[in-house]
Amino acid sequence: MFRVVHGDITRFKAEAIVNAANKYLEHGGGVAYAIAKAASGDVSEYIRISKEEMRKQIGRDWIEHGEVVVTPPLNLAKNGVKYVIHTVGPYCGGKWDEDKRKKLELAILGALKKADELGVRSIAFPAISAGIYGCPLEEVVKTFKLVVNEFLKSAKNVTDVYLVLYSERDYEVALKVLERDEL
């Protein structure tokens, strides 16, 4: 089941939450900063943990579209979170094209596959690339819906996927996009 919800992803109850990270996992702003702050209290410490895990899991100091890094939830465990899955979406700067859609699909699918591999049943995503990366929210929501619904047809463990939107305005825009797509 794919559902769009209004709320704070750092307080959302899901087994995994996804961080919309930059490729160096520096968590300097937006939802990445909020997740790092909520997980550790000390953003620089969470950056250190993230970079250490990236070197262990990927073998280098950056991740590409579709790659993910998993870190412990630390303080987020109180919400039932078992994993934070970091992925990188495309930078749009207000421009959307097929290349950006493909990169976003890779980011979403990479996180979903990793969650399924980890045995996760519920996973919460922010609107990857729709914030400071400047991708149009409407296109991000459409891409999420298509990728998630296709993935759920063959998922072994993941059953519940949430797109968690912090602002009321973004939530209402997303609902309108989904309603239009249903017609």
Curated annotation (Swiss-Prot):
- List the protein's name: Uncharacterized protein PYRAB06560
Q: Which residues form a coiled coil?
A: none
Kindly name one Pfam family recorded for this protein. Macro
- The organism named in the record is Pyrococcus abyssi (strain GE5 / Orsay)
Source organism superkingdom: Archaea
Report the PANTHER family cross-referenced here: GANGLIOSIDE INDUCED DIFFERENTIATION ASSOCIATED PROTEIN 2-RELATED, MACRO DOMAIN-CONTAINING PROTEIN
Q: Which residues form the Macro domain?
A: 1-182
What does UniProt give as the signal peptide span? none
